[in-house]
Amino acid sequence: MSSDRRAFLSAAAAGIAALSLPAALASCARRPDEGGGSGAVGGSDGNRLDAIGVQLYTLRTLLAKDFQGTLASLARIGYREVEFAGLYDRSPADIRAILEREGLMAPAGHYPLEALRDDPNGTLDIATELGHRYVVVAWLAEADRNSADSLRRTAELFNRIGGAAAARDLRFAYHNHDFEFRRVGGEIPFDVLLEETDPGMVWYEMDLFWITKGGKDPLDYFARYPGRFPLVHVKDMAAGERMVDVGAGAIDWARIFARREQAGIEHYFVEHDEPADPLASVTASYRYLRGLRF
């Protein structure tokens, strides 16, 4: 993750802390399907993705200028799900109304670990009103991951947050980068987090670019920890470990998505951290994924 993204999440934390939501709003949320499906459908020509989403960090510059217009553009492309990373100085009620007008749902959102640690009730109120099923932490400070002890303390915190989320009929998840695959004290941090967290309380959003960059095979983790990856970030890698639009790189998407049921994948979010043209990027990725058969 770049320093820009860390700053973006820090700003999001400040925005979340400034919001105060009445508890009564929690019952008004529109929720995505909770059936635990794979997000894919079968056909005579093979399986294909049914619900394709996008991580809104990809379009942050456009959303800051024209929030509703950008969401409307995503709906016109064909997206039906979005994943938030910041609320752009809007109230959850305002955002929910816009989503409903555009026919979009927000099954997940990224929230800073600090917000969930320091104000779990307020943060989970926001997630509930937005209609999330999953509340995701997308970054760990170095102090939370630089030793075996700190990793286990982080896992304990994840379990506590997961319990608080479960009490609200939400699920807590953690999103990886590549640092989780560099050994710390002889251990792989991602493995420690998976082993030390309760499978009934903590899930994972596998970023398929970053795990590839980290030198690991997603299928290995699907086999070792089945059902723990309900969310994936879909972004491609080209020569030189460059991030590119989905379909423009070398990642074998059919191979990965063929194991979606073992992984437990429910939601697929397209992302590109630094696209030259955000709308062109998410359009190209969407078209590739709509045509993919596996």
Features from the language model and the residues they span:
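Gly/Pro-rich active-site loop or hairpin
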Residues: 71, 181-183, 187, 210-265, ...
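N-terminal secretory signal peptides and thylakoid transit peptides that target proteins
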Residues: 1-23, 27
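Conserved, mostly hydrophobic/aromatic
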Residues: 54, 74, 82, 99, ...
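C-terminal segment of N-terminal export signals and the immediately downstream linker at the start
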Residues: 25-62, 73
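Hydrophobic faces of well-ordered beta-strands that scaffold small-molecule active sites
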Residues: 50-55, 82-84, 106-109, 135-137, ...
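Active-site mouth loops of central-metabolism enzymes
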Residues: 55-65, 110-116, 148
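Active-site acidic/histidine proton-transfer and metal-coordination neighborhood
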Residues: 81, 88, 113-204, 211, ...
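Acidic (Asp/Glu)-rich catalytic clusters
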Residues: 42-48, 72-76, 90-106, 119-132, ...
